Amino acid sequence: MTMRKLKKYKPTKFRVRGSKYNKDAADFAVAFIESLCHTKGTWAGKKFELIDWQEQIIRDLFGILKSNGYRQFNTAYIEIPKKQGKSELAAAVALLLTCGDGEERAEVYGCAADRQQASIVFEVAADMVRMCPALNKRVKILASQKRIIYLPTNSFYQVLSA
C-alpha cells in the first residue's frame, strides 16, 4: 500500500499580515515526527510517515511564523474521523512540543473529557518515547502521574481531565 505523500505544499490562506512560511521550521517539525514510530495496529514499529493531509497540518502549524519569529498558530482545532490515527498524530505533536521545540520548561497539556480518554494519547506518546533510543535516554516517564519530562529542558507533557 502506497502512502499519499504531500507533493507540493501550499501554505494556508489563513495567515496574518506579515507572517511567512519558514521551510526550515516546517521541515524540522516533519522530520521530528517522522523519526518516531507508530505504536499500534498494522503500522506498529514502523516509522511515522505523514500522509498528505497530516503533513499539511504540521507544515501550517509549525512553519508559518509571524514577523517576530513566533509561530502564528498556538491553538488548532482539528476534526479527524475514527480510525485515522488521531492518537498517534496527537502524541507525536505533544512530543514535538515537549522535546523538539527547544523551549526551557515548556508545559504541554493533553486534555479530554475524562482521565481515561486523555490517557490514551499519553500511553501512545510514552510508547513512542520507549521506541526511540534518542528520546528514551533523555525522557523520564512518570506513568502514575501521566507525565512525560524531557530532562534537557525540564519541559513536560501532562494529562488533564475535565
Region spans (language model):
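Phosphate/NTP-binding elements of NTP-utilizing enzymes
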Residues: 2-162
